[in-house]
Structures are given as C-alpha cells and as structure tokens.
C-alpha cells in the first residue's frame, strides 16, 4: 500500500476530490477531444498503455478505491469512487482494465477466493502487474453455462485439465483466467463443477484470436491439453464452481450496467463504444433543424439517464439488503435496451452514410451497429436475464428442466449420440 493510500483514512469525500483533481492534473495526460487515444480492446499496445497508467494510479494512491486496504486498495465507499470518476473525466485512464479484470474477476476473488489468492492477485492487478479474464463459454455450450464439458481430473497432488473455451474477452492480454471445469460427472450438472485460476501462458494452453465481422479480434478461444494445476489454483472449493460462477455472473451483470464500485473512470472501456454525440451526427448529416432527429436523440438520451439512476437505485438496494443479488440482472437488462436504442438512433440519423461515404465518424456508426447485439449477450443473454428476474427477484415458478437432478454423465448432450 502506498503512503498516499494511508492518508485517505480520515479524508472527506470533498477533500479526496480536491486531492484527486490536483494529482490528475500533474500526473495523467489529458485527452485531446479531436485526437482521443485509440484504446482498442484487440490491440496489444492498448493493454500495455493501460498497465502503465494503472501503475501510475497505484503509485499515486488512487487505485482500487473500493477494494480493501489489505489487498492494495483504499477501502473507501463508492462515493469516493464516484468523486474520482467525475474528476478523471477528460483524462487518459486505463478503462479497459475494468471489465472483466477488476469488476468481475477481482470482485469474485474478493468474495470467494482464498486469502492467498486475494493477497496475490488482487494486489497484483491493482499494481498494474496482472490482468485477469474469464474462461467460461464452450464451443458446444450455448447459453447453458452449467453444461461445461472441459474436464478436470485428479492426478496425484495436481489437477489435469483438458477441453476448450471460447468467446473469452481479451484473454490474449490476460495473465490468469477464472476457468470453469467439470470435476465430477456423477452428480447433477450444477454440483460437479470447480473453478480454477489458470495461468494463460501455462504449458498445454493454446490460444487463438477470433476475427469479428467489424474487424476486431478481442475475443479468443483456448484449448487445454493436459494442463496441470496445483490444489491452490482451486477457487472457492472443489465442487463449488457453480457458486463461484454465479458470483461472476452477478458482478458481470452489474459491470454491464455500469454499476460496479470497482470500476474506475467514467467512459466506456472501448474507444469504439464511447457515448454517441447526436449533435455532431446531426451537424455532419445536415439535420440540425430536423424535428424527427431531435425527438429520436432526446428519447435515447432520456433512456440513458433513466438507466444510470436505475443502476444507483438497484446498487443501494442490494447493498442494504432490500433487494436480492439477482436484482443486478435488472440493470443488465435495462442497459442492453438503452445501448441498443442509442445505436439504432445513431444509425437512423447517419442513414446510408453509415455504410458508404468518406466521413470516418459516420462510417464508425455503421461499424458499431454491426456489434449492437453484444450488449444482449454479455453477462448472459437478455432471455436469461429475464428468467433470472422472474425466478430470483419476483419469485415466479422455475421453468421445467429435463436434466434437473440427473447425474451429468446421463444427460444427453450435443454430439453424445
């Protein structure tokens, strides 16, 4: 922990804000509006720059504001994080480290990790020395996260992992991944899972980048061939993988809704997902006085404002116990709708200029539209979010499942004959 971190113990939010304002001005580069840094999720240089900026934040005493002090954070409340976020607007920040490294992986380790795992990995991430990712989805798994078939077998004092994962966000830039593995096939599917903290560059791990329709390659697929891990790589206990994964999903839904106290900075973590400037779009397309454009833009901006207030309301509800943890899916669901409305509105304003023409800003609208469905998939599909809200928030009856209570070895699966 830095000396600056120690000084925050008796500091008010306003005092903290003033100190952050002065420190940012002296230590972090300002973003030039017309030449913002290209912090793309699929570029190695972006991740290297993010690590450098994170090291500055840690040295200055502004890293991990809401993480406990004993793991390298400041141990402060979300009000301090919000104050820092407001002051950091307009400065170059390591935003791509937020999701999934801080808001999902480190948050999950904080909940269920061993003391050694928390001390080693949360601290290293806050120092800018480690990046963590999620290794959950599988090639034949679809939306059934509990149906994983990557195998973990006991061999002496170690675990040997074989199988494959896919759609792992930014795994190429990570040092470790939270990997969900099946370690017992003779119990129902949710009971036979174990979560491992797996080194990405470990012998036996092969990683490949996935090319997207918009030209990005931020997602990866991984193949595990006799990957040997020690007992201390287990997170949350053997056979407790579903409980760990559920905490990950809770934190992922909150992060997708921009409501995590572990997220540092205001804007999106990807340069291609920055807030849309409707005024600039109207100006570029010669529609400044178009009533229809004004109405569409107003609706999108209003829904974004409602989403932000909703996130605060649900966060406080979960914090004080008046709402269950599963209420995080409400944020996830509403933010997906708000984000898609924003992109639909931008595409409607840009019209054909989003796909043809010489204006790069308008062409970017078209590129972003191609990936509009991502917000309906991250943290589980929109349909899953609705089921979670229905069953775990509103207490509706659960849907019928043919494999409920059946040993996983007896469950018919794709390709199992």
Question: Residues of each region from the PLM?
Answer:
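Amphipathic, small/basic residue-rich leader segments at the start of a protein or domain
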Residues: 1-99, 120, 124, 286, ...
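Glycine-rich phosphate/cofactor-binding loops in nucleotide/flavin-utilizing enzymes
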Residues: 2-5, 9, 83-84, 104, ...
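Glycine-rich beta->alpha junctions and the first turn(s) of the following alpha-helix
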Residues: 7-11, 16, 205-308, 375, ...
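C-terminal helix-coil-helix/basic helical segment that borders enzyme active sites and/or dimer interfaces
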Residues: 32-41, 283, 287, 291-294, ...
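Internal helix-loop-helix
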Residues: 51-129, 170-176, 304, 311, ...
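A short, Trp-centered hydrophobic/proline-enriched beta-strand micro-motif
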Residues: 128-136, 180
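A structural signal for short hydrophobic beta-strand segments in well-ordered beta-sheet cores
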Residues: 150-153
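A short core secondary-structure module
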Residues: 157-158, 162-208
């Amino acid at each position: 922990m830095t000396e600056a971190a120690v000084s925050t113990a008796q500091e008010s939010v306003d005092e903290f804000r003033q100190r952050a304002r002065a420190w940012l001005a002296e230590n972090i580069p300002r973003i030039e509006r017309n030449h913002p840094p290209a912090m793309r999720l699929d570029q190695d240089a972006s991740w290297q720059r993010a690590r450098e900026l994170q090291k500055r934040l840690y040295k200055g005493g502004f890293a991990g504001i809401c993480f406990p002090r004993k793991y390298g954070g400041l141990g402060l409340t979300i009000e301090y994080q919000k104050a820092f976020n407001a002051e950091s607007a307009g400065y170059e920040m390591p935003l791509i480290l937020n999701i999934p490294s801080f808001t999902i992986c480190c948050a999950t380790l904080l909940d269920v990790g061993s003391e050694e795992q928390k001390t080693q990995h949360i601290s290293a991430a806050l120092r800018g020395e480690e990046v963590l990712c999620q290794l959950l989805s599988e090639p034949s798994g679809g939306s059934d996260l509990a149906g994983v078939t990557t195998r973990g077998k006991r061999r002496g004092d170690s675990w040997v992992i074989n199988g494959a994962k896919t759609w792992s966000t930014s795994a190429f830039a990570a040092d470790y991944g939270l990997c969900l593995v099946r370690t017992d096939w003779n119990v129902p599917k949710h009971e036979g899972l174990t979560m491992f903290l797996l080194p990405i560059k470990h012998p036996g791990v092969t990683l490949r980048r996935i090319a997207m329709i918009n030209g990005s390659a931020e997602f990866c697929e991984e193949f595990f061939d006799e990957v040997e891990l020690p007992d201390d790589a287990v997170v949350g206990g053997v056979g407790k993988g579903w409980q760990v994964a559920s905490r990950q999903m809770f934190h992922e839904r909150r992060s997708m809704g921009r409501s995590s106290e572990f997220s540092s900075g205001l804007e999106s973590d990807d340069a291609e997902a920055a807030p849309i400037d409707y005024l600039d779009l109207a100006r570029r397309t010669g529609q400044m006085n178009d009533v229809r454009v004004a109405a569409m833009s107003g609706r999108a901006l209003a829904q974004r404002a409602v989403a932000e207030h909703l996130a605060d309301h649900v966060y406080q509800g979960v914090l004080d116990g008046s709402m269950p943890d599963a209420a995080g899916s409400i944020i996830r669901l509403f933010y997906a709708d708000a984000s898609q409305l924003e992109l639909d509105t931008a595409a409607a304003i840009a019209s054909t200029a989003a796909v043809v023409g010489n204006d790069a800003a308008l062409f970017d609208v078209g590129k972003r539209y191609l990936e509009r469905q991502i917000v309906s998939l991250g943290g589980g599909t929109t349909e899953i979010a609705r089921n979670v809200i229905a069953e775990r928030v509103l207490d509706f009856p659960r849907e019928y499942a043919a494999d409920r209570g059946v040993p996983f070895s007896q469950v018919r699966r794709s390709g199992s004959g």
